[in-house]
Amino acid sequence: MERASERSRVARDVAPLARASRPDDVIHSFSIESSPFVVTSSLVIARASTRAPTMKFGNRAIISPSLLSCDFARMADESRKVIECGADWLHLDVMDGHFVPNLTFGAPVLASLRPHVPEAYFDVHLMVSNPRDYVEPMAKVKTNMFTFHVEACAGEADVETLCAEVRKAGMEVGVAIKPGTSAESVCAFVDKGLVDMVLVMTVEPGFGGQKFNPECAKKAATLRAKFPDLKIQVDGGLAPSTIEVAAEAGANVIVAGSSVFGSEDWTRAIDTLRAGVKKFNE
């Protein structure tokens, strides 16, 4: 009952942000911290130029199970199985042990996996200090979505240059923001058409199985209010008990690890997540 009450409170908090009183409302936050991209989340509504209605966007619900939670010894088999169970994308967390403390897999593992799932959509989340070094290797393994952290870049010009390099290499561009980074820090890149997706982390990146941080969902609401047709991905602690908070805020691309791979019925787990997104976004 206590968790249900907390979920209801957060949903009430987030819903007004995602459904701002006017279509041209934009949500801004202030209180700047040390990083050029990090801003805390004191929320203020500000008027912007004409925008489309906030929650009427054309992107369908996309479920991207994280292979960080699969059995690494059976990665190919479990990748095939999770696709058969209804997964839209495969989420691959590449960590270098420097940008985040954990170390996972890189291009050689993805190259080995690709022949087993030749048609799969590789949704690669790079938690690395030098994402530019990964553009060519990830393109070679036919990565579809190349998502890097703005916190790993020196500034806006560096982000824009990297976005262009990723596009030139034939991949879609995703930018990720950690819990301490504001949604506003990536708006300029979306406005300029440089970005296909924004990944909002709802846990600190680096390890799977963490608890969902509902305050981070407000950033999805900020982005959805400004960009009705943007792919907004949420990653961290997503499960049937938290999916509706993220979906009502505007997330339509859902990363789920343990809630899928730790379930006895992967099809049912994926269907439940998809239904949670569709409830608010279709």
Predicted regions and their residues:
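Surface-exposed amphipathic alpha-helices with a cationic face
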Residues: 56, 83, 111-115, 139, ...
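Conserved anion-binding
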Residues: 133-137, 143-222, 226
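Glycine-rich phosphate-binding active-site loops on the catalytic face of alpha/beta enzymes
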Residues: 148-153, 202-208, 250-269
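Conserved, mostly hydrophobic/aromatic
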Residues: 75, 93, 138, 198, ...
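C-terminal helical cap(s) of enzyme catalytic domains, especially alpha/beta-barrels
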Residues: 262-282
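Conserved N-terminal beta1-alpha1 strand-loop-helix module at the mouth
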Residues: 54-141, 153-156, 173, 187-194, ...
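N-terminal chloroplast transit peptides
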Residues: 1-20, 24-37, 41-44
